[in-house]
């Protein structure tokens, strides 16, 4: 890797040392060196090898600036994290006001904020939702979803789509594509995770009819897959199969939720009422890490029975 780092450093333009980050304490060159040495050398180098030498400095609204001053419109938005733009003034103001009195709290006790946010999520979700459990990221929220459907059904198998991605945490990673999990030996037990082709209703039924599947998890629009749109009626057909064979449907709305598709939740376009909705990214406003698992009374019955275990 040393030679690659050298090649990257050699590309930095003359005089770049004089360009400072925000408060003037760090140059772009120093930031590059730190990322290569202490953060993620492969990811950093890969983008530079493609000619994309961005080190993000200032960010505001739907734009950010490279440390060399070049302005970019952010159409990526971190998968919806910045639905409201970078450093949205209303979000910043709410957090600044909140930290005058609040901190992370205590996981044993309720609070005004937890109760109000849970109520807002439940009441704006699809019909039948009852509970909202909070996490710090989308992957963790998927883990909660998988734990919930396993508890509710007393089954263990999780079915997902080929080429899917649901997060880098343990259970979420095991439900994802081999590209993300196999290198880390997180493939999970084969008998508990299975993937089927997208839009293949027959393949889905072939797995579900064994009546040993706890949950089917599907991104309403599979993002890491390349944003293919499900064929009309596919998601509704999957939900019908879930109901037929006693399986719970998890809608991964981390990227498609919170109005990003024009409706509060992307699954609403399909006329499907899932048993679980997973939310994250944009829920944080891009400032405070928070995600949520929204569940029906059936899917979330552990909350009533063994709520202290989480």
Spans of model-derived segments:
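Conserved N-terminal phosphate-binding loop of PLP-dependent enzymes in the Aspartate aminotransferase
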Residues: 3-310
